[in-house]
């Protein structure tokens, strides 16, 4: 079937890197909503949705997130991220390797993270709105 072939091709293409984490985010006035997908040898092994307090600035909050979240974890070979992350001055060690794909399998997994993020954002945002009423 088509889906099986697509999955197989993704595994083959993604397995060129041993470990990839896909990070997608969006912000509102006070919070950063993020989804992280964890791929190991081309296979999606975990997904985490997070709400991060927005500190001084978006780039500072994202930098602190990466430092704290990965403090006790092995860094992946690459992070697949939205293009705007590359524009931030994150001041992270050179061990953090960010890729912002425009096409191909890496773009597809970023799109998948963004779909998950939008779903998470809508649910969380609705919960927040209901709490305020």
Regions found by a protein language model. Give the residues of each.
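Conserved catalytic/ligand-binding micro-motifs in nucleotide and anionic cofactor chemistry
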Residues: 2-133
